[in-house]
């Protein structure tokens, strides 16, 4: 895991001239890519997704689709996937799922821009 991801055990450093460990997200692309060629998919920061957060139903589903919007009387939360530098290795996986309020900011959370592969680009 250390070659491709960040977690609580491998993201600390001691800035020059300072005492005490400090923890924070790392610059993108400093670790090796995973088997799909993607960087920083495990650890570093958890990622907010476009999907609204709601509890899963009782049945198993593959790629469940959430609502387009939530009722105004329901707390507005997005799905947050994966673990970050502040979590242990077992939580640094893309299937880790949590809720994150849309009106909050946090140095533990980021997002990933995704674009389909462009064909015949010169």
Predicted segments, located by residue:
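Short, well-ordered junction/capping motifs at the entry into regular secondary structure
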Residues: 1-42, 98
């Amino acid at each position: 895991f250390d070659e491709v991801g960040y977690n609580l055990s491998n993201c600390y450093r001691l800035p020059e001239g300072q005492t005490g460990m400090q923890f924070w997200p790392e610059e993108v692309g400093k670790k090796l890519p995973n088997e799909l060629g993607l960087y920083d998919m495990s650890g570093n920061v958890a990622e907010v997704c476009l999907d609204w957060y709601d509890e899963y139903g009782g049945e198993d589903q593959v790629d469940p689709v959430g609502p387009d919007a939530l009722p105004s009387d329901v707390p507005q939360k997005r799905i947050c996937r994966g673990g970050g530098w502040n979590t242990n290795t077992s939580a640094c996986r893309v299937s880790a799922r949590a809720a994150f309020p849309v009106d909050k900011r946090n140095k533990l959370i980021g997002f990933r821009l995704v674009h389909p592969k462009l064909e015949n680009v010169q």
